[in-house]
């Protein structure tokens, strides 16, 4: 069996354009996985292998690539940096043991870097920091280090320092080993010399080394005591302390370089091996109860000797067929084995297993705990499903995905395209849990739902190019919701007599606003049997089914509490169906009385703008009903954070680019639902009524 201490499962994540994919390419080149280096500038990289990715120069899917460095196996996942694809970042963090956060030397800590950093903190993933693009105009390593402290609240441990600035950037100083690495102009990563530290940098290097040593020895009380008494720790002792501090998230070893110019990548690879944890050094994944989702107290111990347990974290349909990416947490998996999908209760036989090299694949006959592999041709497996030993059923902690906030109606251009479109969308939904589809029951339209405009643009693009389905695309629609604002007590009787046995159900109930985010909650405090206990679930079912369509404009209803406290029944005519119908009638009767209100999705918006356009940008956000929450002046411009209704953000990127001469950037993610102003609500309700009348 392969020694688990020689495994590293790592992710590379950052803001769009910080250089993640280029960094991954350079890692693959250095580890001998590719011979000609791809380049995002011309759309030829190994991990960006979808047409849409190559064309837009952004990474959409997390491609998994295996490679080797210093006798260690590195499974590298290149994650997308655009906020519409954060679900991919979240998904990959779930299966990683460590990561590299890439920051742009001139852009610094940009909006998406902050979101990804927050996700990684929540997942407790150990990270290295790579400050990239130091050959760029305006690049400043020390300023980015400062931003990491101030904006992310993190402790960077400076491991390398840049030699030269901007176009004169020629190499880096390894602070720990007091060595200078200088590359020639050939652009080849292997063409470097180890030299003495430049004379004008010696004092700076010593100051940073002292800080490095002081921070590192805090991880070992005995070593710290010896250091205080004047004993210099050895390189090996320091490495051990840095490894421990990195694993415990006490600090983040920080490196610098230029991936595009092939400078500084070797030191990052050495650091991955030296400081990031092996699979058996991270907290094992908890096992959960299949029905409640609560942790059982058991864990999936990372060992090849345990029963088989794995998590399916990505489904992909490519030119090779259906691929299910899995991270194996425990046990071994051999070709021909039968495994249980604990989510469906069905078993599947493992046909082909492959190790992915981005768009290439190597056939495998077996895999073990710590491996990230793809299984070919699995049926009925979705993202987040647990695969396990047939004799040892278990469920790993499931993945939770954000709710889509934007939708569009689509239809095939030609009549014969419906079936083709349905099959294609089915595959795409299996691949991306944040992308959803539903059919409008009244119009029969197919509605696609996603995380943002770019997300849906790409999906429509994939349908056209990958699956050959030409579409007619409607206007984006906002996912409004409805709720109530007042608590009321009410009563409703359902009575029907038409020969034979009739229907009778009477309910007395209280209906009131619930806590934000609770959805629908139901309770019964009936005493004395006026509504027999066997009918309570029918009352709950009736109310719950009506939550799908609110009374104002037909949007789903949020955050309502219903308490059944009394009622009446008939020994012959009462039935579950009668009480269910009574609850539906009660909902229709009481919602308007309880002050029904329209809610709209509010987005957390993060805008970067050059300083001379701040006034324009803030004025524009105010016109969009935005609430400015924070403003931070940075190196190259100003970050503005605020809450803005989604309905006001369509087409914003175009406006922002015009206002800032193409230099502005923004990201947004769903924050919460808030009441619509009356003028907006009236417009939305009127439009919904018009559409209903037209149907």
Curated annotation (Swiss-Prot):
Q: Which Pfam families match?
A: EFG_C, EFG_III, EFG_IV, GTP_EFTU, GTP_EFTU_D2
Which positions carry the signal peptide feature in this UniProt record? none
Q: Where is the tr-type G domain?
A: 5-280
Q: Please give the Gene Ontology molecular function terms for this protein.
A: GTP binding; GTPase activity; guanosine tetraphosphate binding; translation elongation factor activity
Binding residue positions for GTP: 14-21, 78-82, 132-135
Its annotated compartments are:
Cytoplasm
Tell me which Gene Ontology terms the entry assigns under biological process: ribosome disassembly
Q: What is its main location?
A: cytoplasm
GO cellular component, alphabetical, reads:
cytoplasm
Is Secreted given among the entry's keywords?
no
Keywords from the named record: Cytoplasm, Elongation factor, GTP-binding, Nucleotide-binding, Protein biosynthesis
- Protein purpose: Catalyzes the GTP-dependent ribosomal translocation step during translation elongation. During this step, the ribosome changes from the pre-translocational (PRE) to the post-translocational (POST) state as the newly formed A-site-bound peptidyl-tRNA and P-site-bound deacylated tRNA move to the P and E sites, respectively. Catalyzes the coordinated movement of the two tRNA molecules, the mRNA and conformational changes in the ribosome.
Q: Name the family.
A: Belongs to the TRAFAC class translation factor GTPase superfamily. Classic translation factor GTPase family. EF-G/EF-2 subfamily.
Note the NCBIfam families from the entry.
EF-G, PRK12740.1-5, small_GTP
What is the name of this protein? Elongation factor G 2
* Species the sequence originates in: Aliivibrio fischeri (strain ATCC 700601 / ES114)
Question: Lineage in the entry?
Answer: Bacteria, Pseudomonadati, Pseudomonadota, Gammaproteobacteria, Vibrionales
